[in-house]
Amino acid sequence: MLKQANQQVLINHNRLLTRSFSRRFFLKGLIFSAWAPYSLSTPIKLELDKVKLYSAATDHKGDHWLVIANAKGESLNQLRLPSRAHQVFKHPSLPLVCVVARRPGKYLSLVHMNTGTLIKTISPSKGYHFYGHGLFTQDGRYLVTSENHIKSGEGRITIRDRLSEFSIVYQYASQGVGPHEIKLTNNGQTLVVANGGIKTHPDKGREKLNLNTMRPSLVYLELLTGKLLEKVSLPEQLHQLSIRHIDINQHNHVVIAMQYQGDKTDQVALMATHKRGEYIRLLNAPINSYLAMKHYCGSVCFDFSGMYAAATSPKGDRVTIWDTVKGNIVDELRCRDACGIAAFGKQGFVVSSGAGKLYHYNIEHKELKRLLPQTFLTAPPLVESKVNVPSPSKRMAWDNHLSISI
């Protein structure tokens, strides 16, 4: 425990050191390494009429939906889901989106993005459940998911082949417990896994069963074999800092957003970065900035430049912006129940909230602006062919994650 250890973690010249200092882990004493600067990418020109947003959502009755919307946040298609979902992501070339059930998940829904029609529902193998995240490989052939082997409590990566009706063709250990978000490096051959370290069991719902012994990790695996290429963890004193959500930029640098499972009075960093062959680097921020995040980050992503990252903290009603080259926070904004976030425009992000609102953030101007003229996301007008669409006058709350296709 941090309070018992009375230690402080310092990051200095890419080396992790521990030294006795105070009752808790104090952020103001951290020394942070910065990456060498690199030039910004060529800005992406957006054709707004082609932009689509994807997210799970919940209506006023507690029913759960897949929502596909345009750049203004106007709903284009919706599909009722059997239970609450977590992540939605698009196939790289086909008009197909995948919806992953929230942990402990029991379904994947494959949906036609242009019609909102359910194409296929996939259940986990016996003795497994989904952990809320997945991805399609760059060539679009394979569907990859993070899963839990219930009996052992160990994480698994499962790969299904689209060309054989999404049957399982590869399955291997995630090299940790509680794998959550997964990403591919730019070559498409290496899978990066955020092993949150938290053991769960479906019979216990969402109860966390191993908080005293949890050991999160960030691992790099060979995609089609599961061969361990690299595994990194934070120091033992931070073993309750769950590595949950990640993103990768064009330089294969990883940004990490974490959730702390320890004492509520502990003062800990929640944001970090990693580069192959190095240690995990915590990002610098004033103590009050991290405290305002309430030990919880909900989602994270890089902007298109790969230099800046944004993280949401729904428990703290915060959106924070980070310069990953300098290794520090550059902006923070209040945003009620902000959670979903995705890169959008030149050095910008779209943020979704549990209040049903959408915002655009511009790094240059440091402004967070509403995208919707109305307060809540609403459904399109009812038509006979869309019997599953709820009343357009009822509020819909965006769920944890947001995806964008251009």
Predicted regions and their residues:
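A short beta-strand motif characteristic of beta-propeller blades
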Residues: 74-79, 119-124, 167-172, 227-235, ...
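Residue-level detector of Asp-centered blade-edge/turn motifs that repeat once per structural unit
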Residues: 92-93, 138-139, 186-187, 249-250, ...
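Repeated scaffold domains used in trafficking and secretory/extracellular systems
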Residues: 83-89, 129-135, 177-183, 240-245, ...
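Short, conserved, GDST-rich strand-edge loop motifs in beta-rich repeat architectures
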Residues: 146-149, 193-214, 257-268
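Asp-box/WD-like beta-propeller blade repeats and closely related beta-sheet repeat scaffolds
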Residues: 127-133, 146-185
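Beta-propeller blade signature
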Residues: 157-162, 211-223, 269-276
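N-terminal export signals
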Residues: 2-45
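Blade-loop segments of beta-propeller domains
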Residues: 81-110, 116-136
